[in-house]
Amino acid sequence: MNITKAYVIFFLVVILTNSLSNSDALASSVIETTKNDVCSTPCTIRYGTFECFQDCILDHFRDGNCINGRCCCKY
């Protein structure tokens, strides 16, 4: 009886853990960056969205923004 109870508890813990995990985090970051053409420089507190945008415009891109910690420029 104790072994069956342990298996049921283990099964429920696995199901609960799986349902609470955020499996969309990686997929959303990949989908979001595929809309951009070049992602190079890491974004920091000192190198933010404004600096990223300026660098992208100076490099003849149409747009630029910090996405997932990287400066991504669009053609």
Swiss-Prot record:
Concerning InterPro entries, the annotation shows: Defensin-like_dom
**Cellular component aspect of the GO annotation:** extracellular region
Q: Does the keyword Zinc feature in the UniProt annotation?
A: no
Signal sequence interval, chain numbering: 1-19
User: Does the record's keyword annotation contain Secreted?
Assistant: yes
Q: Which domain of life is it from?
A: Eukaryota
> Where does the record say this protein resides?
Secreted
Q: Enumerate the UniProt keywords alphabetically.
A: Antimicrobial, Disulfide bond, Fungicide, Plant defense, Secreted, Signal
BP GO annotations: defense response to fungus; killing of cells of another organism
Q: According to the UniProt record, which cysteines are disulfide-bonded?
A: C39-C73, C43-C66, C52-C71, C56-C72
Stretches that traverse the bilayer: none
Q: Which Pfam families match?
A: Defensin (PF24552)
Which family does the record assign?
Answer: Belongs to the DEFL family.
**Name of the protein in question:** Putative defensin-like protein 55
